């Protein structure tokens, strides 16, 4: 089947500047391209050719100084030659692209709350839902949000959790990885400290300021503790704004060392996870489900996260981490950090459990296989001219499984 992946206007593929959606796409392509002829339409980048074929995947990179320019270029590159057009995170684009290629089927991959009234009006939302053959979401939280606003969408919703490549991450408890861990920690002056790790964009909604506040009391009781902050204001750049400046100023009062790495290329992220002892995600917004949780699990780190959006769906309380209900209270975060610092055996057990979960449940092969089930079911029905039965086939033939930590049933 010939498939077009329509990527957002934000960042290019492959993820040379990072980005959760971009990493997701790169992760599944090696598996999907073995079964389907895939063209990836993404944003132009000075460091990448406008067109190329890599590992059976065709890439076409389009200019897009504005969202409208990018959409126009997408329309110029979409035609009925594709059996399926899979649109990432832009329900508003489904109808304009469908008008350009009325002979193609469409599907949608949701990574944010893109069906909220401030994102799309009701008329276009309903047209989008009616047009697409299926919708995948990265969390139950996102799926439930769509269903709550548009119950008619329920038959088309499929939760497909994201993934990670565990082989890129080096669990901190394995002896063979200790030399590289020690070398990196020494490079940053952290070799004598327990390192609390934050990875993500430096924005108020990601909550690093809450972690800094929490570290004030942690460092009072545990002076051999350090904070490492990996990330920048935006993907691929190291410019600052008022928030990042205030954040750095806040750390000046901390008694222990603090390291801001700035933006790191995606290829550098896995080894930097090995520097940490405890991973903390302090999201303050309705996070769809931050992919850093998968990365922390792969690195074998115990996780402390806030109960925001879909984050809790991949945390099994007391098994691979802890979910903090009081998401905006620094002391609630600090209490969990101190608990893990004081109970090293529990921290190690959580980290080892998380690594196992990442290996068995949150790898890219599992993500790709779930997508292949949807694609295969659709292509089979389409070939027989019976597309109307597609949704019932998916619901009847897809096994149920429980949401980690929640116990609710879902379609994978």
Spans of features found by a protein language model:
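Conserved donor-binding/catalytic core segment of Leloir-type glycosyltransferases
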Residues: 4-6, 136, 185, 190-206, ...
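Short His-centered aromatic/hydrophobic patch
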Residues: 87-93, 110
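Nucleotide-activated donor-binding/catalytic signature segment of Leloir-type glycosyltransferases, i.e.
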Residues: 241-263
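Short alpha-helical donor nucleotide-sugar binding micro-motif in glycosyltransferases
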Residues: 263, 271-276
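Acidic donor-binding loop of glycosyltransferase active sites
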Residues: 274-288, 301
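Short hydrophobic beta-strand element within catalytic cores of glycosyltransferases
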Residues: 302-305, 315
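A short, well-ordered alpha-helix in the C-terminal region of glycosyltransferases
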Residues: 332, 339, 346-360
């Amino acid at each position: 089947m010939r498939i077009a992946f329509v990527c957002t206007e934000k960042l290019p593929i492959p993820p040379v500047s990072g980005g959760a959606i971009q990493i997701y796409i790169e992760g599944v392509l090696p598996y999907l391209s073995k079964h389907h002829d895939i063209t990836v339409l993404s944003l132009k980048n000075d460091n990448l050719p406008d067109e190329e074929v890599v590992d059976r995947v065709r890439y076409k990179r389009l200019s897009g100084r504005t969202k409208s320019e990018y959409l126009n270029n997408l329309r110029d590159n979409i035609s009925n030659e594709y059996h399926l057009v899979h649109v990432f995170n832009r329900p508003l684009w489904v109808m304009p692209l469908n008008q350009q290629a009325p002979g193609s089927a469409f599907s949608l991959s949701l990574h944010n709350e893109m069906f909220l009234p401030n994102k799309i009006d009701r008329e276009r939302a309903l047209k989008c839902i009616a047009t697409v053959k299926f919708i995948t979401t990265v969390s139950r939280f996102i799926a439930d949000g769509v269903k709550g606003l548009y119950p008619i969408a329920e038959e088309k919703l499929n939760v497909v959790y994201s993934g990670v490549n565990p082989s890129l991450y080096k669990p901190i408890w394995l002896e063979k990885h200790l030399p590289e861990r020690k070398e990196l920690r020494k490079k940053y002056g952290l070799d004598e400290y327990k390192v609390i790790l934050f990875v993500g964009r430096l924005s108020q909604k990601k909550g690093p300021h809450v972690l800094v506040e929490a570290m004030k009391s942690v460092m009072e009781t545990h002076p051999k503790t350090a904070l490492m902050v990996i990330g920048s204001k935006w993907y691929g750049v190291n410019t600052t704004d008022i928030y990042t400046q205030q954040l750095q100023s806040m750390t000046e009062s901390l008694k222990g060392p603090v390291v801001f790495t700035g933006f790191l290329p995606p290829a550098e992220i896995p080894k930097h996870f090995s520097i940490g002892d405890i991973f903390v995600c302090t999201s303050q917004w309705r996070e769809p489900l931050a992919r850093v949780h998968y990365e922390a699990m792969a690195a074998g780190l115990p996780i402390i996260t806030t109960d925001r959006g879909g984050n809790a769906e991949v945390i099994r309380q007391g098994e691979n981490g802890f979910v903090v209900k009081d998401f905006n209270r620094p002391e609630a975060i600090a209490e969990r950090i101190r608990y893990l610092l004081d109970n090293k055996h529990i921290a190690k057990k959580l980290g080892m459990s998380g690594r196992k979960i990442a290996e068995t449940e949150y790898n890219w092969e599992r993500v790709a296989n779930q997508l292949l089930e949807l694609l295969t079911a659709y292509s089979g029905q389409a070939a027989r001219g019976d597309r109307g039965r597609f949704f019932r086939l998916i619901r009847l033939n897809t096994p149920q499984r429980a949401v980690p930590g929640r116990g609710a049933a879902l379609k994978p």
